[in-house]
Curated annotation (Swiss-Prot):
It comes from the Bacteria. GO terms for molecular function: ATP binding; ATP-dependent protein folding chaperone; isomerase activity; unfolded protein binding. Its EC number is 5.6.1.7. Belongs to the chaperonin (HSP60) family. Keywords: ATP-binding, Chaperone, Cytoplasm, Isomerase, Nucleotide-binding. CDD domains: GroEL. The gene is groEL. It is found in: Cytoplasm. Gene3D superfamilies: GroEL, GroEL-like equatorial domain, TCP-1-like chaperonin intermediate domain. This is Chaperonin GroEL. It catalyses: ATP + H2O + a folded polypeptide = ADP + phosphate + an unfolded polypeptide.
Length: 541
């Protein structure tokens, strides 16, 4: 296919036009007085949101050159979202500022490759300074502040802090849509997995249709159980003790299942059977997790164990087991606490080593089930449009809170970036030429988030930036009350990881765009598409 090529200034200006179209759409959402953007959807109601990456993902421009520029900045937002889960609007805004200032200097004759070196040096210094000023997130109040600032809603911040308090920092917190109008928090204690009972006849509570056992034995195996003879020896030992039994196996079918149900109906012996969670290697790992949690031994050919020779010592126990048609929950397993701790540390190491996002997510779920539990935030709203917007805000706030717990927090509202400017300015003494110009580009870009927050509040950004720069560290501008305050004391904080990632990703992509000297796109074909074939029916007479 034939290509069209643009060079030098013409190419860079076309790319910049695309960058500006995307960034101008996203940046109106920044700050406590930022607005929303409405996005048309082919199916369902339009989406109203202030989430930077959601807006960026929807933007495709007609002009191919402009679209390339937009896609590059979209990558800044997406990468920041992947790493930190929030800060996508800040990242987009920083990228726009670096590209704007950089292209001015390239047009004036600066060498882009040397500019890039200066930009990188300045970013490294700024990031180091951010880490030095970062404060540890300790206590429920600090966690609530990060969530509240990200979602612009104190209630959401409090909800996330409650969830983290109940399931721990490693716990899984999921966000789901509620059928009611209110937003609530449900906490599942212990280990839960998505496998329910194999027969409804096994329930102990017919009203709730669930089986609840206190202090039962737990039999774990990766085999199929087809006949009751396979497990008869161990069943006889359990019946003698008058205890109940939870069986977790690859499957239980035919005569084995029928016999267990029959004994339950006759009142001889109470048992509930479920399939093992997961598939393949993940199933083996999850069975091992349950074994460690409950103090059981997985009866498996690989380990040299057979069901027929299984003994009571191989079974695990737990304070309570609850099984409904979809889920099994094990609360307070009787496993050895040091073995559980070792297993948790092993999973943490696997999380650090894996490169797959899917594997990381599954490992984090396993970690949560072993170490804390699962909290579910049920999001409610009056309309579907409000529900979608609220759910996105809560997801962002949750990501921001996790990032804060991980790397600490800095003053929010763009103040932390303004306060690292003196450290960046110190570089001007040790650099020269175009490298020095690169440092100046970052120095100017660091003001941009605060300028935009002020502009979105209908105020003059330059005056506010000047005032914050001349104030001591930690002082910033609260756009909601329009006062200068100590940002951390006022609870206006950003996670260090979010601010750092936004700056690093913006500088990385922007510096690459500045070094562009040619741009190539496909030439659009003006040929009309092929006409449709003749319709069916009788030919004309």
């Amino acid at each position: 296919m034939a290509k069209e090529i643009k060079f030098a200034e013409e190419a860079r200006r076309s790319l910049e036009a695309g960058v500006n179209k995307l960034a101008d759409t996203v940046k109106v959402t920044l700050g406590p007085k930022g607005r929303n953007v409405i996005i048309d959807k082919k199916f369902g109601s339009p989406l109203i949101t202030n989430d930077g990456v959601t807006i960026a993902r929807e933007i495709e421009l007609e002009d191919a050159y402009e679209n390339m520029g937009a896609q590059l900045v979209k990558e800044v937002a997406t990468k920041t979202n992947d790493v930190a889960g929030d800060g996508t609007t800040t990242a987009t805004l920083l990228a726009q500022a670096i590209i704007r200032e950089g292209l001015k200097n390239v047009a004036a004759g600066a060498n882009p490759m040397i500019l890039k070196k200066g930009i990188q040096k300045a970013v490294d210094v700024a990031v180091e300074e951010l880490k030095n000023t970062s404060q540890k997130v300790e206590g429920k109040e600090a966690i609530a502040q990060i969530g509240a600032v990200s979602a612009a809603d104190e209630e959401i911040g409090q909800l996330i802090a409650d969830a983290m308090e109940k399931v721990g920092n490693d716990g899984v917190i999921t966000v789901e849509e509620s059928k009611s109008m209110g937003t609530t928090l449900d906490v599942v204690e212990g280990m839960q997995f998505d496998r329910g009972y194999l027969s409804a006849y096994m329930v102990t509570d017919t009203e709730k249709m669930e089986a609840v056992f206190n202090d039962p034995y737990i039999l774990l195996t990766d085999k199929k159980i087809n006949t009751v003879q396979e497990i008869l020896p161990v069943l006889e030992q359990i019946v003698q003790q008058g205890r109940k039994l939870l069986i977790i196996a690859e499957d239980i079918e035919g005569e084995a299942l029928a016999t267990l149900v029959l004994n339950k109906l006759r009142g001889t012996f109470e048992c509930v059977a479920v399939k093992a969670p997961g598939f393949g290697d993940r199933r083996k790992a999850m069975l091992d997790d349950i074994a460690v949690l409950t103090g059981a031994t997985v009866i498996s050919d690989e380990l040299g164990y057979d069901l027929k020779t299984a003994t009571i010592d191989m079974l695990g126990t737990a304070r309570t087991v609850k099984v409904d048609k979809d889920n099994t929950t094990i609360v307070e397993g009787a496993g050895d606490s040091s073995a559980i701790k070792d297993r948790v540390n092993q999973i943490k190491r696997q999380i650090e080593e894996t490169t797959s996002d899917f594997d990381k997510e599954k490992l984090q779920e396993r970690l949560a089930k072993l170490s804390g539990g699962v909290a579910v935030i049920q999001v409610g709203a009056a309309t579907e449009t409000e529900l979608k917007e609220r759910k996105l805000r809560i997801e962002d706030a949750l990501n921001a809170t996790r990032a804060g717990v991980e790397e600490g927090m800095v003053a929010g509202g763009g103040a932390s970036l303004v306060h690292v400017i003196p450290a960046v300015e110190a570089l001007l003494e040790t650099t020269e030429g175009d490298e020095r110009t690169g440092v100046k580009i970052i120095r100017r870009a660091l003001e941009e988030p605060l300028r935009q927050i002020a502009a979105n509040a209908g105020l003059e950004g330059s005056v506010i930036v000047e005032k914050v720069m001349s104030s001591e560290k930690g002082i910033g501008f609260d756009a909601l009350t329009e006062k200068y305050v100590n940002m951390i004391e006022a609870g206006i904080v950003d996670p260090t990881k979010v601010t750092r990632s936004a700056l690093q990703n913006a500088a990385s992509v922007s510096a690459m765009l500045l070094t562009t000297e040619g741009a190539i796109v496909d030439i659009k074909s003006d040929e009309p598409s092929m006409p449709g074939g003749m319709g069916g029916g009788m030919p004309m007479m």
